[in-house]
Structure formats: structure tokens, C-alpha cells
């Protein structure tokens, strides 16, 4: 069944069901959860096979310990709670002396791969960021790139990889759950992923997952074999 869809279509399906689930418009059980995991994994595997020649690893000694690239699946205004969370994080990174590059990959409910599906939606994009190269939050200024929401994942990935090979960050911080671009970048450079909801682990293929709280006693066995960073 999954072989009937290409990578863009599979990722589109996964994103739409993520939205429906967040809005409590569908209920999932273990079987449907596992199906969604297979959909995401299949999409990732196809993308990886098509792009692996571009994903050459950047050795640690070539990367700048003071530089971090932050990828986010969506960046809107200050009334948008996930955007406020991201701003808090990048401001702290700057206080720690890091040079931070922010990239909005615009992957939140992207239109690429669109197929007929129940109640579809496309993620919002802040028009004022479209041609911006610098973004200011209060007194703090950051280098910035917003990738066109019309680009496919493969084109988004090429754009991010150009930046990464130019600035050579020590690592990538991916904010938001289910960033295919960040998951693929993790093949070239260490990538830590963090959900914008503090209490949840992000959905990611990358091994480094950040949890925005301490691990509870009853979770220790579940997380024992995961590389979970508490923050």
C-alpha cells in the first residue's frame, strides 16, 4: 500500500494526520500510531536514497563550537505560542555566547505532495519574513532565512545544506516535531530535536531528543535506551 505513494505524498499524509490529531479531530490507537510511524519512515527512506550523495558528514574538527543553526518548521508572530518558545531558546543560546542562525523550513503542513484527504490545511507563513536576512526579537538580532513554502523537501534540504557547509555549525537544533529536513541533515551533522510542547518528546529519526523537563520516575524504563536530553 505505501509503495503506491511517493515521498512527498507520504510526508503530506503524515503532516495532515498530525494536524488532525492535534486538533482532536481523529483518535489514534496503537495500530494507527504504528501505521503513521511506517508512513514517516517510508517517506524518510525514499528521501534519503535520493539525497544521500549530498549528505557527506562534516568532521567535528571542521565545525565551529560557537555556531549553531536552529531549524524550525514554522515561525510566525509573537502571538504564536510555538514561536515564543523558539524565541526564548535562541535568546538563551545567544546569552551563552553562541552565533545563532535561524532557518524557517516552512514544513508545517506543507502543500508539496498534496493528495485528496479529509479537511486538508496548509501551514501559515509570515509574509514579512519572506525576504528577510536578519530577524530581531527585542534587542537581539539573528541571521535568518525563510525557505519558500512552495519548495519540495529535496529543495529545502539543498538550501539548508548550502548554509551548513558555509557556516559549519557545531550542531543543529531542530525545533518542532516531524521536520524531515532536520532528520535528513542529521546524516551530515549532529542534530538535536526538541518538540515545542515542553512535556513531549519530538517525532524525529535523529537519536538526540530533548525533553523540556526532567524525566519522571515512571518514564525511566521507557526512555532507558533513548538518547534523551533533559532540559
Protein language model regions, located:
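Short His-Asn-centered micro-motif
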Residues: 71-72, 104, 173-176, 194-195, ...
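Structural alpha-beta junctions
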Residues: 91-102, 136-143, 187, 226-229
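Conserved nucleotide-sugar phosphate-binding/catalytic loop shared by glycosyltransferases and other
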Residues: 114-153
